[in-house]
Regions:
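Non-catalytic beta/alpha edge segments that cap or flank active sites
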Residues: 1-119
Length: 119
């Protein structure tokens, strides 16, 4: 997603009108001039969820030092979690292995269905 305005519009529509629990973006998170996914994602956020992007980056650093070049973010808009993923299919799979196990709990919290956070 290289057009920040279009991406902001799409993310807003999906979160607000479609009321999705989870939106995943792929690509546009590097240092290139057209990599604007993190900025567009931050622009629609109502709250930050930095731990997800941090966990993905930490796991990715064990695989390649270039993971430090990721600018991916994770945010909340209303009751929707938005997570930026890398553009590489291999890196997407590796990233999903990191955060998917926590998604039922995270999404349950956003929906107000989970009360016990201590476990």
């Amino acid at each position: 997603a290289d057009d920040a305005a279009a991406l902001k519009t799409t993310l807003t529509r999906l979160a607000d009108q479609r009321q999705l629990d989870l939106i995943l973006t792929t690509g546009g998170t590097g240092f290139g001039p057209r990599d604007v996914t993190p900025e567009a994602t931050m622009a629609v956020a109502t709250r930050l969820a930095p731990g997800i992007a941090e966990a993905i980056r930490a796991a990715s650093l064990a695989i390649t030092p270039r993971a430090m070049l990721s600018r991916a973010v994770s945010v909340i808009r209303g009751k929707t979690l938005i997570v930026n993923l890398p553009g590489s299919p291999k890196a997407v799979c590796e990233s999903m292995d990191v955060f998917l196990p926590q998604m039922p709990h995270a999404l349950g919290l956003l929906r107000g269905e989970v009360r016990d956070c201590a476990r």
